[in-house]
Amino acid sequence: MTALPSPDRPRILVANDDGIFSPGIKALALALADVGDVVVVAPDVEQSAVGHGITIRRPLRFKHTASAGFGTLPAYRVDGTPADCVVLGVHLLGRPDLVVSGINLGSNLGDDLTHSGTVAAAIEGLALGLPSIAFSQQGNGGGEYSFTAGAAYAARLARAVLAKGLPPRVLLNVNFPAGLPRGVRITKVGEHRWEDSIITRHDPEGREYHWVAGQSRAADAHDPDTDYGAVQAGYVSVTPVRLDLTARDLLGELAGYVPEI
């Protein structure tokens, strides 16, 4: 039987991009159950790297599920994007006090933020006027992830954000290192980027198809002030991210050479 929400406890909406059956979202939701009344709304299949896409050309299915391992926590699966999950969760289940996304299988550092579905779910929460946090876990290189330390820290950080709040239009992007964290660093977004490569093959009928592959690169891998540098050094990276992407330092310079209409 689904536990009823308590009027004395904060409401927490948990989403992700790895899908509702991901071990990361299960670890996060169960840890946050000690903080508030948790409801899970996640994609029914993996939606990694879809960015902040919103589905507007077809209807969406929003279904309760009891088979994803969340125990008494209410959980819903959506045949849409991570941002869709937040939109539907907020509008169909009521406004939460906090939106949390993750824990992602793999880091979201530097330029990853621009295509991360995990971060996009937090951005959608922020766009709806709700404090939001995205959590991601670095892998050990062998395709394995440990969420114990990250989930415990996520609960502590959620308590702090619920108590103190966040500045308007600012979310937190949090990344956990593969091993036991050495500490926590407040960081800036680094220059960690993905260099694409295309693998071209042919199907049995000779028709060409392509895989987008690539390799991550970091221009500032040893800068301790960046998200990438902190995680590589074994620290939890907590990065405040603004929804406003304006390059304010260039406003005056552009006015000097942008032509009039």
From Swiss-Prot:
It comes from Deinococcus geothermalis (strain DSM 11300 / CIP 105573 / AG-3a). It catalyses: a ribonucleoside 5'-phosphate + H2O = a ribonucleoside + phosphate. The gene is surE. Nucleotidase that shows phosphatase activity on nucleoside 5'-monophosphates. Belongs to the SurE nucleotidase family. Its EC number is 3.1.3.5. Its main location: cytoplasm. It holds the Pfam family SurE. A divalent metal cation binds at D17, D18, S48, N104. Its cofactor is a divalent metal cation. Transmembrane segments: none annotated. NCBIfam families: PRK00346.1-4 (NF001490), surE (TIGR00087). One of its GO terms (molecular function) is exopolyphosphatase activity. InterPro entries: SurE, SurE-like_Pase/nucleotidase, SurE-like_sf. The keyword Metal-binding applies. This is 5'-nucleotidase SurE. Keywords: Cytoplasm, Hydrolase, Metal-binding, Nucleotide-binding. Binds 1 divalent metal cation per subunit. It comes from the Bacteria. The keyword Hydrolase applies. One of its GO terms (cellular component) is cytoplasm. It is found in: Cytoplasm.
